[in-house]
Structure formats: C-alpha cells, structure tokens
Amino acid sequence: MALSSRLWRLLPLLRGAEQSVCQLARSWGSGGRCGTWGFRGSEVTGNTRAFKRGLLFSALSYLGFETYQVISQAAVVHATAKVEEILEQADYLYESGETEKLYQLLTQYKESEDVELLWRLARASRDIAQLCKTSEEEKKVLLYEALEYAKRALEKKGSSFAAHKWYAICISDVGDYEGIKVKIANAYVIKEHFEKAIELNPKDATSIHLMGIWCYTFAEMPWYQRRIAEVLFANPPSSTYEEALKYFHRAEEVDPNFYSKNLLLLGKTYLKLNNKKLAAFWLVKAKSYPAHTEEDKQIQTEAAQLLTGL
C-alpha cells in the first residue's frame, strides 16, 4: 500500500516534467538560436528523448529501492514475529517440564544469532545433560555445547542479564572436566558474570540465588582445595556462610518460593551456622515444595533426610 501511494505521487511529476521538455522542444524547434547555449530544435528533440529515458530510468531505480525497503521491512517484521512465536513455545515447554521436546525445538535454530534463542539453547542443552538417562560422554558434549551457545549469546548482546547468567553457569559446569587449577581460576569469571547479571536485573531471583551458591561453595571448600588455591593464586576466591545466607534470603525476598533448591540451601546454611530452629523451618518448606521436576524430587528427599538427623 505504501509503495503504491508513492508510485501514484511520482507519476504526475514525471508527466509534468515530460510536458515541460516537449514545450521547450517546440519553442526551440524553429532552428533559431536561443540564449547563450544556442540549442537547435533537433538537438532539443534528441535531448528530450534522452531526458525522458533518464527520467524513466530514475523512476524505475526509485521504485526498485522503495520495493527493496518495503520487502526488507516486511522480512524483518516476519522474522521478529517468528522468533517471538518460537520463544513462546519454548517457554511453554520449559514451564511444562518438557525437557526433551524443548531441546528438539530449539536445536532447529542453533545457527540463529538471536540472543534470546541462544541463551535458551544453553539452558536446554544443560537440562538434557542433567537427565539421569544421559550418559557421561553425552553429558560432557552437551555441557560444552551449552557453553558455546551461552558464549555466542554474550558476544551478541553484552547487556543481556540472562546471557551473563548462563555463561557463568556453563563455565562452572565444564570446570569439572578441566582440573582444579582451571576450576578455581574460573571462579573469578563466574562471580563477575553473576554480579553483572544481578546488576543488569536486580529482580532476577535466580541470579541472586546462584551468587549465593558461589559463596556457599567457597565457604565449604575442603582444606586441600583451599591449600591448592593458596599455592596457585595470591588472592584465592573465598567467602562465608553468612554471605551465602544473605544472597539466599535476598533471592527469597525478590521471588518467594521460586525454587526448591533455594529453600534447601537456606536450611543447609543455617545448619552450617548451628541454627537448628531456622534450619528446620526452611527444610520443612523444601520438603513440602511441589515436585515439578526430577530435581524437585531429589531436593524433597534430601530435605527429609536432613530433618531426620535434626
């Protein structure tokens, strides 16, 4: 519609220009000289035809450009609409716990440069890797695949909190295959990206929770790993249970009961701090959490075991 209206506006201008040139040709067609340029009638008539051809060529060029613009804009709108549709399907499958169907859907678009698709691909690959039926060899391949997707997402859009979050998660996962030195060195990178994710989106409870896990992990680091870290690094990463507790509570404040593992870790952290009353409070909540996933079931079992030992 926009292209048609532009063409309609252009045609009168072309007709007007053609008539003006023809009038000039007739007025100069007597063979006399006119003005300082001294055109002869035949020259003007010839130039008229050339000018008309030029106008036609210009019009076609203009229309070609306009057509290109309209088609390009339509393609962008269509592509955007398609991505939005895929994301809606992906989020529905994720919320429904359809891990394998989600992975099958998203891997069709693994060559995409869309950051929203890429970080979801990282998450989906990691979720498949965590399934009980996934072999150790397949798990390793999937975790490195997830890291590559997360890396591409981050390179595509450094302001995406989700890209920072999943890049940090995936680096942590592959650390199990790269030795203690690399794993400890990566801890700095992981912390940096979790902190950036929180900065970009302070309302994302998952990023805050993961920062809590980072603190908890280094608070309970075995003495031999701590010793290795001290030998390898001048300032090895470290944290405390109090700091971990702060992040777990903050995550709960942002989004109450968002994740069974956050409830479990609140209970476990209070146990580490010898506060059995508050530990029991959070462990009961973890045990009672509705089991939507395999992880939820495992957390229910662990919470029940810890409560038995109190």
From Swiss-Prot:
Keywords: Cytoplasm, Cytoskeleton, Microtubule, Repeat, TPR repeat. Coiled coil: none annotated. GO terms for cellular component: cytoplasm; mitochondrion; mitotic spindle pole; spindle microtubule. Pfam families: RMD1-3. It is found in: Cytoplasm; Cytoplasm, Cytoskeleton, Spindle; Cytoplasm, Cytoskeleton, Spindle pole. The modification N6-succinyllysine is found at residue 165. Its main location: cytoplasm. It comes from the Eukaryota. InterPro entries: RMD1-3_a_helical_rpt, TPR-like_helical_dom_sf. TPR repeats lie at residues 168-204, 222-258. Disulfide bonds: none annotated. GO terms for molecular function: microtubule binding. Belongs to the RMDN family. Interacts with microtubules. PANTHER family: REGULATOR OF MICROTUBULE DYNAMICS PROTEIN, REGULATOR OF MICROTUBULE DYNAMICS PROTEIN 1. This is Regulator of microtubule dynamics protein 1. It comes from Rattus norvegicus (Rat). The gene is Rmdn1.
